Amino acid sequence: MSPHQLSITGIGTVSPFGPLRGLIGQRKTELRTVTAWPTDGVRRAFLVEPFRPADVVPGLKTRRLDRLSGWCLVATALALADARLDLNGENRSRIAVVLGTGFGCIELTEAFLQSAAANGYAQADPILFPETLTNAPAAHVARVFGIRGPNITLSHKGLSGEGAVMQAASLLRGGQADLAIVLAGDTLTRTMYEWFEAAAVLSRAASAPAPVPFSPQRDGFVPGESATAVVMESADRARSRGAPVYATFRTGFMASDPNAGVSVARRALAGSSPPDVRMVIASTNGSAALDDLEGATIREVFGGEAPVIAPKTFLGESDSCGILRLIAALSWADNQARPLAMLLGTSLAGGCAALSFELR
């Protein structure tokens, strides 16, 4: 096998489906009513039900952490277990942690700034400040699991999850790590929801059961929240240790221009032809401008040949849900014979991305 072939061998998620090890399967999720803060009009979101991380990972302490940090720790533990990895037998200096997030630890950032506004910075809670840093979740993963390799956090708007996969692939293919824990996550908070409301980007179709990408009735997106962790390693390494393989990452490309989707997707085909792609994983979310832009890319590159799945219909919109969208597609493709899939990402403010995978 080529050293450029990279396998996903472990999956852990904290999502509206709950904390899960491995594939999501054919589970269903429901829109929930936002009750933690007052809202203007429609009050719907794909929310993670509250849970105690220590109930999922015994002994895990998260009381002083931002929710995102706690979720990333849980997702990492689940992914490592799913990959059948015992870190005691690994060189922890050769393990990388890569996190993609749109907003980072926004919940405790809000709390810290509110404390500073009310009492002045001199009286603001100093314990909160370290947990406001965007790279805090990745740092906690390294601390808790004793990982000493490259530790990178990136934020690329709506392409943060896709960017994390590509950064991890660069580290692995460049020989800087043997193994990567790839994380992506964001939480929904009052300030974020209020901003969405003020910007008039949320769907207000209260009667709709879910966002409706590509539908003439679409009128905006429904927000979501999640944290996802996957273990990536070379295909040779995965095979030698008998690890389960969910998908093989082939290649990926990004552009800062959201209108460059056609050229980016064609580059990501990497020698394959459009009919070879058996599944297009869209990032459409019910917003007319984004749906029209990505829809045009799909029609131009793939015509009407490739099946399209729009996971934000049941996951909601968040800047870092690219990896979770892939996991959802893996669940739907579980019984197919190793199809080629294209993960598309379109962000009107962040550009576009296309990543190709061979599903198991």
Give the predicted meaning of each segment.
Residues 72-84, 134-137, 142-145, 151-184, ...:
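Active-site-proximal alpha-helical scaffold in enzymes
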Residues 5-8, 25-140, 144-153, 186-188, ...:
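Conserved beta-ketoacyl condensing-enzyme motif
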Residues 10-12, 98-100, 155, 180-186, ...:
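Short beta-strand segments
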Residues 19, 108-111, 165, 191-196, ...:
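Short acidic, glycine/serine/threonine-rich loops at helix termini
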